[in-house]
Amino acid sequence: MTQKLHIKTWGCQMNEYDSSKMADLLLSTHGLELTEAPEEADVLLLNTCSIREKAQEKVFHQLGRWKELKKNNPNLVIGVGGCVASQEGEHIRHRAPYVDIIFGPQTLHRLPEMINQIRGGKSSVVDVSFPEIEKFDRLPEPRAEGPTAFVSIMEGCNKYCTFCVVPYTRGEEVSRPVDDVLFEIAQLAEQGVREVNLLGQNVNAYRGPTHDGQICSFAELLRLVASIDGIDRLRFTTSHPIEFTNDIIDVYRDTPELVSFLHLPVQAGSDRVLTMMKRGHTALEYKSIIRKLRAVRPDIQISSDFIVGFPGETAEDFEQTMNLIAQVNFDMSFSFVYSARPGTPAADMPDDVTEDEKKQRLYVLQERINQQAAQFSRRMLGTEQRVLVEGPSKKDIMELTGRTETNRIVNFQGSPEMIGKFVDVKITDVYTNSLRGEVVRTEDEMGLRIAQSPQEVMNRTRKEDELGVGRYHG
């Protein structure tokens, strides 16, 4: 009988990506097929996130439910991975001794051996080490699930913002070799993927080794990915302002595959708070990046992350954040009330903003962002938008759904052969979380792209010195 795997995932897109890789890996090594029902599973995996408050308690609450399943099925293998496992591995083992496997984000590729060890009689396995890039070398070939795909290009972060656990849970920055990234994307393109989202905790810090011992910058990687036949849309997340260099802005100038949408977290608009957060940039420097981007891409829309109620944040500091929001005119945000993360420098600061004040500030901030987002949506009414068709609409399976370049969901009537392709849609209705439209042009009528060699694309950034020797600039 086929064995089953159930994975519960919390947190960021990197965690979602990791979970999909776990599923692919265990299907190839153990024949484990995914199930949505934990009670059907032979292996249960919890992929955790430590960003939100009370992350530990959430983990133990979930494990308590699974403990009952283990009582009924002693052969059930339970594993805990992700950032909470990385931080609290030994604590999990002591408090929940029925957990068999504890693994970190960088050791998920060792899951097959860990499962074999447990089934071979070992009582428990804990591996939360940071073996650098080995993880990617041991994963199976990518499998496309629709026309969009995530591809991890780097892991970890060296920035050590005072509120953040990522450097402690995922380690320092490690970039995948450029050839590995391009090969994975080419494989996905052959399977019908049209849009790729490059992932990393600090994605624009990418410095990928090349086959000849050189280093490929993030800007160069973007151009190489854009040149892969079949890839017509390119996104990336999450980036950091201090790594957002002019050579990346140049890619927006001349690479139409790179979408006119950017998620660039700023966290606060007060320089005093940014300094306490150890962000490494000022509000003015952030605005300068946006100004340069809009000079080359006037239609680009920006989303961000904000933390309100950081230790020491005054009403005046918050007002400066609101001013920044108005000046940049963000289209969307992921906004959170500050809560201390164990082991971070900010956890030692006095948490002196009251919970009521934090909630009030969050409400005010989100209301402003929602107003700005609604204005952007209203401006789209009557316009034509290019939509990548992802499949049937969740609201009405007789309709199709897809996303615009600026990440808006659009629902419309269409035929099944449109799935996985682009259509141009005239926007007829605007709702809070989606748009509605009518198809005016199919992909066959677009003349989408002229094939270009990777060398032609790279030549956009290539200059020659006085001796005729090529050199990259940026």
UniProtKB/Swiss-Prot annotation:
Domain TRAM span(s) in chain numbering? 378-441
Annotated catalysed reactions: N(6)-dimethylallyladenosine(37) in tRNA + (sulfur carrier)-SH + AH2 + 2 S-adenosyl-L-methionine = 2-methylsulfanyl-N(6)-dimethylallyladenosine(37) in tRNA + (sulfur carrier)-H + 5'-deoxyadenosine + L-methionine + A + S-adenosyl-L-homocysteine + 2 H(+)
Q: The MTTase N-terminal domain covers which part of the protein? A: 3-120
Highest taxon, organism lineage: Bacteria
Its name, as the record gives it, is tRNA-2-methylthio-N(6)-dimethylallyladenosine synthase
On cofactor binding, the record's note says:
Binds 2 [4Fe-4S] clusters. One cluster is coordinated with 3 cysteines and an exchangeable S-adenosyl-L-methionine.
Per its record, what are the GO molecular function terms? Answer: 4 iron, 4 sulfur cluster binding; metal ion binding; N6-isopentenyladenosine methylthiotransferase activity
Question: Which EC class does it fall in?
Answer: transferase
User: Coding gene?
Assistant: miaB
Give the GO cellular component terms, alphabetically.
Answer: cytosol
